[in-house]
Regions:
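Sec-dependent signal peptide recognition
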Residues: 2-10
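N-terminal helix-rich structural modules
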Residues: 26-250
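C-terminal motif of bacterial Sec signal peptides marking the signal peptidase cleavage site
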Residues: 15-19
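Bacterial signal peptide processing site
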Residues: 21-23
């Protein structure tokens, strides 16, 4: 029997859904959805309505800032996660065909799994999801939707399909098998076209250059290790003016 994982959705129960005594109504739909080994539930936050306005505003801005980091997490987990998610979301929002078929239900379930796991790999096993719908079905659904709905995603259609349906491509988000090159065999986007030996040597050289520092920093945090056009290893740092700058700018603004 599969282990049941639970998404706790922090839904604030508005006064209209509570009785005068402050308790939730018995018919409140606490279970929002369930698919595979996931159950989505909501719960009440006692006392939220009694908070001062300033504290409610603080919670709002913190939650908005967190949402701005969502696409960053998707991209960090695998380089194709965002194109896959956005393509499927466009289909989900615009498809006018029969939504009662088994293949549509399978596509919908796959998208929900991508939403929950922040990508195409299982949040616990790190294995890539196996679609229960066919590539032909997805392409047929895409063809029924005007191209302008997909925008720049049109040029990535082949890459998206390969990422979903080719079991040899991005098979695991995180490989920890002894003897394997853990970077080249993992699908996470923290390292791009860089081997484990190259990464270890890069950071060893960086640490050696800073050997006299009585308070050395940790290396390799908040960055992607990749190669420039000349093949030299370099870091793309997540910061204002660096990698993910538009999202980080918005986070800074909200905070």
């Amino acid at each position: 029997m599969k282990k049941l994982f639970t998404i706790v959705s922090m839904t604030l129960i508005i006064p209209a859904l509570t009785s005068c005594g402050g308790g939730p109504k018995g018919d409140m739909p606490w279970i929002v959805d369930r698919f595979d080994d996931i159950k989505v539930i909501r719960y009440e936050v006692p006392g939220f309505d009694a908070l001062p306005l300033e504290e409610k505003e603080l919670i709002y801005y913190l939650s908005e800032a967190a949402k701005c980091g969502r696409d960053i997490l998707f991209d960090q987990n695998c380089p194709v996660n965002l194109p896959v998610r956005r393509t499927l979301e466009t289909v989900y929002e615009n498809y006018k065909g029969d939504r009662t078929t088994a293949e549509w239900k399978a596509l919908e379930k796959y998208l929900k799994k991508v939403w929950f796991a922040n990508g195409i790999h299982h949040h616990y096993s790190n294995d890539k999801f196996v679609p229960e719908f066919t590539e032909g079905y997805l392409l047929d659904a895409i063809e029924t939707i005007p191209e302008e709905k997909f925008g720049s995603l049109n040029s990535l259609r082949g890459e998206v399909c390969r990422a979903i349906f080719d079991p040899a491509l991005y098979p695991t988000k995180l490989n920890q098998k002894a003897g394997d090159d853990l970077l080249l065999t993992s699908s996470s986007n923290y390292y791009h076209n860089v081997s484990q030996a190259e990464a270890e040597a890069f950071y060893a050289d960086m640490a050696a250059a800073d050997a006299g520092n009585p308070e050395p920093v940790s290396y390799g945090l908040n960055s992607q290790l990749t190669k420039d056009d000349a093949g030299r290893i370099c870091e793309r740092v997540w910061k204002l003016g660096g990698m993910y700058s538009p999202a980080i700018e918005r986070i800074v603004y909200l905070l």
